[in-house]
Swiss-Prot record:
UniProt-recorded name of the protein: Probable methylthioribulose-1-phosphate dehydratase
Pathway: Amino-acid biosynthesis; L-methionine biosynthesis via salvage pathway; L-methionine from S-methyl-5-thio-alpha-D-ribose 1-phosphate: step 2/6
Cofactor binding annotation: Binds 1 zinc ion per subunit.
Entry-linked PANTHER family: METHYLTHIORIBULOSE-1-PHOSPHATE DEHYDRATASE
Family to which the UniProt record says this protein belongs: Belongs to the aldolase class II family. MtnB subfamily.
Entry's EC annotation: 4.2.1.109
GO CC, alphabetical: cytoplasm
Binding site residues for Zn(2+): H118, H120, H197
Positions of substrate binding: C100
Enzyme active site: E141
Keyword vocabulary terms for this entry: Amino-acid biosynthesis, Cytoplasm, Lyase, Metal-binding, Methionine biosynthesis, Zinc
Cofactor(s) this protein requires: Zn(2+)
Highest taxon above the source species: Eukaryota
Length: 239
């Protein structure tokens, strides 16, 4: 393959994930849609939660302190890899960039993520109160929907899902260092729980991140019900 052909092929690969702003899967449109879905699930009520998606060399992030179910495409911030805002929201509203931004970039820098999602799910908060340093569960079918961050392969039915827990802080940005340290200690995990607060989940693509957060929240809700019934989260006698 000559140099020109190689460069052309490389450019096509780099552009393959970039779609026009009118496309429903462009982050300007996708982030508001996902925020509405998360709001309906109770994961982003009261202006809580956050969503960030990478496309090309840009990072798209929802604003902070707004009604997440009412975010519009022209209200999204665009950042570069240095966390500099390269495009302000195209609105007259005085919007503030998400407090989650440095935590999103933990996932981008340390995991090469394509998306990072932050929820304030009640299931996450309850699990963080029931567990000490980790949430662990095995032998549940929905575990198969979660990717091992190191091997990039899906977990199996008999595998144990392990999600670490860090302590909450008064300000979101102050979680940055403890989240990064936790990610170093748990290289296989695609999520971090914040006690009495919520959860961060990331993956290579927004589709995988969305699937992971849905599976994890399901498993946490199930675990809470299992606890009330006296059922073990890591049973030893399952065939």
């Amino acid at each position: 393959m000559d140099t020109l052909t190689h460069l052309s092929h490389t450019l096509r690969e780099a552009m393959s994930d970039i779609v026009p702003e009118s496309h429903p899967e462009h982050p300007f449109n996708l982030i508001p849609e996902l925020c509405r879905k998360f709001y309906d699930l109770g994961w982003a009520t009261g202006t809580g939660g956050g969503i960030s998606i990478k496309m090309g060399e840009n990072y798209y992030i929802a604003p902070s302190g707004v009604q997440k179910e009412r975010i519009k495409p022209n209200e999204i911030f665009v950042l570069n890899a240095s966390q500099d805002v390269v495009e302000e929201p195209r609105t007259e509203k005085q919007l503030k960039i998400s407090e989650c931004t440095p935590l999103f970039f933990n996932a981008y820098r340390m995991r090469g993520a394509g998306a990072c999602l932050h929820t304030h799910s009640a299931n996450c908060v309850l699990i963080s109160l029931l567990c000490d340093r980790e949430f662990r569960i095995s032998h549940i079918e929905m575990i198969k929907g979660i990717i091992n961050n190191e091997t990039k392969k899906a977990l199996g039915f008999r595998d144990t899902l392990v999600i670490p827990i860090i302590e909450n802080t008064d300000f979101e940005r102050d979680l940055t260092a403890s989240m990064a340290e936790c990610m170093e200690r748990y290289p296989e995990s695609c999520a971090v729980l914040v006690r009495r607060h919520g959860m961060y989940v990331w993956s290579d693509t927004w589709q995988k991140a969305k699937g992971a957060v849905e599976c994890i929240d399901y498993l946490m809700g199930l675990a809470i019900r299992m606890r009330t019934l006296g059922l073990e989260w890591e049973p030893k006698d399952v065939k």
